[in-house]
Amino acid sequence: MVIVKKVILNNVKTHSKREFDFEKGINLILGPNGSGKTTLVESIFLALFGGDFARVIDYFKKGEKTMAITLILEDKGKTYRIRRKWVLENNAKLVESSLELIDTIPKKLASDHNKLLQQIKHLFGLDKKIIPLIYYKQNEITKIIEMDPRKRKEWFDEILGIKDLEEFSEKLKMAIKLIKTGKISRIEDRIKLLKAELNKKSLLENKLKNYKEKLVLLSNELENLEKEYKILENQYKEYLELKAKLKSIEGQINNINVKEIESKINNIREELNNIEELTDYEKDILSKKHEIIRCNEIKNRLKELEKEIKDYDKIKKEFLEIESKYKQYEEKRLEYEKAKMLEKEKEKAKREYSYLLKEKESLEKEIAELQNKINQIKELEKMEQELLEIQERIGVIKAKLKLLENIKDRCPLCGAKLSSDTIEHLQKEREKLQKEYYYLKEKYNQLLIKIRALEKYKGLEKVLEAKTKHLETIENRLKEIKPIIELEIPKIELDESIPYKYKQLLNKVSYLEAKIKEYERYKNIECPYDIAIEELKRIEDKYNKYIKKPALERELNLLLKELERYNSLLKEKEEILSKLNPEIETKYKELTKKKENLLSEISKVKGIIKEIESQIKEIEKHESTIKQLEEKKRKWEKLVEKLNRIVKALGRDGIPKALREGAINYINDMANIYLREFTDKYKLKVNNDLSIYAIPIDNPHYEIEAKNLSGGEKVVFSLSIALAIISWLSLQNMFMVLDEPTANLDNERTLALRKTFDKLEKMVEQAIIVTHNELLDTGENHVVRL
């Protein structure tokens, strides 16, 4: 149901900057020759299809470098804007191509030429192919009737898409050829090569068998060698261990000086005999020594404590001062906590106040809107009354229309014969009543929609009352909160260093008081340090000799153990020498070399076996590949078979013929339906060869070739066929453009054509007629004057 609403031209031929409005129904573009009428309608198609419609450079206004066309379309209640802009360089360059939905919020649907063409096809069903059906240039309105049947068939096939099917069929034939010579041929060559490779498999299998037998022999030989080697390996390990142990023992024996050890043992024993007599002094010396150590510890601790407690008085004084400040701090802190709580309450109140203000503002708006809707309900009664009046008037019109419906030549009431003027008058009256009926019907529907929309507002008084009460509650709460917000809270500053200093000094004082107590305790301990020193000096010489006894005993034990170890090593050396067999080493080295050679040979054979197996596997893969390739070949052959069937179906006696005949049958039926709206003199017949004939209603056996009809009749036939084709293409309610349809017609035929156009209004949503002939203006059509 697409119609043109507005065309805006900038520098298009004779039009510098102009806007043209169009309406639903018949639109006349009236003006003398050369006024730019044809340019205006061609601009519609230039906006839709750009350079695909015509050579853009020919439309630039002389001397201008830019040109723009804006087209406003309406379809299914939605409004669209198409804009194209060109600049003149060496040629006309398209710099803007856009499509927007401009109902409420603008939405861009396309921003380049190709996307725009796609959207025009998708949204409105328009493409370049249907231009000949909806746009008739000067002297072309009867071209469907007048063109040669062969050309008509070509034109008809292009519109139906049969030409596209033929092109598609040729492309399929080319694809079939490429598949046969390319894909299938390459697959066959590949299969041939792979089958040649398969013949090598048996030779490789025999070779593999020989090498596997050789590997078994070598493995058996290695197994026997391994058993012998394992026994000898353990013997050889024992041999090496004994050899290493012997070397270690000999080294240790050489490091021991036996004579020197024996001399030292004798000297130490003699010295120990001399020390035995000093044993009685041991307990006394130890007692005095412990007494001296204890006294030294007490003296040292007293010195440490004196250092620590010397600043006690000063710290105690500082503590008393800070204690007073701490008490003041605690009092102030309680006030601070109280102020902080008040501040939190105030902030909470502020947030609540702000929220309530917003809610109040929102409620006030809602109440105002509700009040407005309630006021609208009062208009409902007036609308309902108006609806009843319209219903009554529609009933009256329906009755009159029913009465006038079957008027031919006699009065439906009295049966009297009517004059032609009376019949014409009654027909005009009927048309007038029909227009009034459609107008009232539309008004009735609009009122009904408004009434239904307003009915939902009933019962809003209770909602308004509830909202008003809620508003009062909010206002009362705002009054309660306001004093809290306005409350002045005193600012209190706390010195946070005071509690820290207080705790620090308290810990110091407590620590020092504990140390003073410890100092007093140590001071009262008796310590006979000087007496113990005097007695220790008296027995010191004897003591110094005595204290050497443990060291001498330890040294003696070590020397005795070393002598014992020497004797043990000599014995162990003799045992090892009796076990050593030098032949084991020679035999072990020979066997190791033999094993290495055998392992190398086995590894080499395994490598060859692996390589042969890999080659066999690769060849076996060829079998799978051949199957896959053969399956692939079958698929391509099936595809070729299917494509050949499609090509056959697309041949002359296939789909194109069925499509053409189906379309011709449909067009015959629909064209006659449209033709009956224009005239009751003829029926229309379109043959399969697309020859067109007129059959007189009063003589159905007589056929007239349509091109031999009068000018006005040819126009009617052309329009009927065009409308039928549009219907076949599912493009009903499309707009139509006729350029100078009355050219070469006299006044009588022009007036007859005007009646045809009046009937055309029922068949298309919009018709735009370009003319210089004022006779086409009935006074009821929308006129654009140039």
Swiss-Prot record:
Residues involved in Zn(2+) binding: C411, C414
Annotated Zinc-hook domain residues: 366-459
Pfam families referenced in this protein's UniProt entry, alphabetically: AAA_23 (PF13476)
Co-factor note (free text): Binds 1 zinc ion per homodimer.
Single GO molecular function: ATP hydrolysis activity
UniProt keyword DNA damage, yes or no: yes
Highest taxon of source: Archaea
BP-aspect Gene Ontology terms: double-strand break repair
Stored InterPro entries: P-loop_NTPase, Rad50/SbcC_AAA
Hydrolase keyword on record: yes
Residues annotated as binding ATP: K13, N33, G34, S35, G36, K37, T38, T39, Q138
Needed cofactors: Zn(2+)
Coiled-coil residues: 194-249, 337-455, 551-650
Keyword set, alphabetical order: ATP-binding, Coiled coil, DNA damage, DNA repair, Hydrolase, Metal-binding, Nucleotide-binding, Zinc
Domain notes: The two conserved Cys that bind zinc constitute the zinc-hook, which separates the large intramolecular coiled coil regions. The 2 Cys residues coordinate one molecule of zinc with the help of the 2 Cys residues of the zinc-hook of another Rad50 molecule, thereby forming a V-shaped homodimer.
Primary role: Part of the Rad50/Mre11 complex, which is involved in the early steps of DNA double-strand break (DSB) repair. The complex may facilitate opening of the processed DNA ends to aid in the recruitment of HerA and NurA. Rad50 controls the balance between DNA end bridging and DNA resection via ATP-dependent structural rearrangements of the Rad50/Mre11 complex.
Subunit structure, interactors included: Homodimer. Forms a heterotetramer composed of two Mre11 subunits and two Rad50 subunits.
Entry's family note: Belongs to the SMC family. RAD50 subfamily.
Descriptive protein name: DNA double-strand break repair Rad50 ATPase
Organism of this sequence: Nanoarchaeum equitans (strain Kin4-M)
